[in-house]
Amino acid sequence: MGSSSKEETASDGDTASGGASPSNDGRLFSEGERVLAYHGPRVYGAKVQKVELRKKEWKYFVHYLGWNKNWDEWVSADRLLKHTEENLVKQKALDKKQGVEKGTKSGRSAQTKTRSSADTKADKDDTKTNAAKGKKRKHESGNEKDNVTAEKLMKIQIPASLKKQLTDDWEYIAQKDKVVKLPRSPNVDEILSKYLEFKTKKDGMVTDSVAEILKGIRSYFDKALPVMLLYKKERRQYQESIVDDTSPSTVYGAEHLLRLFVKLPDLFSYVNMEEETWSRMQQTLSDFLKFIQKNQSTFLLPSAYDSDKVSDGKGKGKDD
């Protein structure tokens, strides 16, 4: 997914430019400037790499510190904050509100939180701190040398045809003003079940590790979708479609599942596991992507997209 194929996914909340003062030509931020950037409902450390005037509005190409470059994107000034102590406090408050501040969750929190460091130094320090903690735990169990982080090992190769799908997905939503019709069929749960059936027929059985990885994909998808897998104009549709205890994996399909795979290396960046475990997981994820590619004509269809119409009791509402 190229840098040009990214829609602005700003939060609908408070998105002021954080006390920025315009330059003589109206720019609020400059190339090379370290900033804080909204992505979904949270704020992340970022760096402005390019600045361009587009349709009488300044746009800023940002790189989220510690994230894969596939998530670099063009944003408006209302997505950015100056890197100040005041705004760092705001960042921490938003993180706490979303339940991702360190120590607010036990057990699974290390596997589900995303990187939210304000700058490169903090990013590196956090990584070192977590790695040190992981090594300490492994040392106590006698397996320190086998302990590695996903950041070093997790490399998911997305097939070319699926990369094109990700680009097409962006174009449908950002340029053609469409959204994926919900509920999708097959949905994520059904796709995972179909893969399980496929593996059973192919190999005669499915190992416990494969089954656990598939359960993990479902869990990550349900947690990640509302905070990092939706474009801005998809949010009202999400609010209308996911009610009560409905799981996103029973409503959304392969289009949104592919977005998760782009994000997985970052989601796994704090997880410490034995190298053999990571290797097995990477192999399963790659095989699963090949399965989606093989069934692309069934799972991923242009007809799955429809115009984003104003809610009239029949269609989904447009997030203006």
Swiss-Prot record:
The keyword Transferase does not apply. Keywords: Chromatin regulator, Nucleus, Transcription, Transcription regulation. It is found in: Nucleus. The keyword Phosphoprotein does not apply. Residues 1-28, 93-147 are annotated as: Disordered. Pfam families: MRG, MSL3_chromo-like. PANTHER family: MORTALITY FACTOR 4-LIKE PROTEIN (PTHR10880), MSL COMPLEX SUBUNIT 3 (PTHR10880:SF15). This is Protein MRG1. The gene is MRG1.
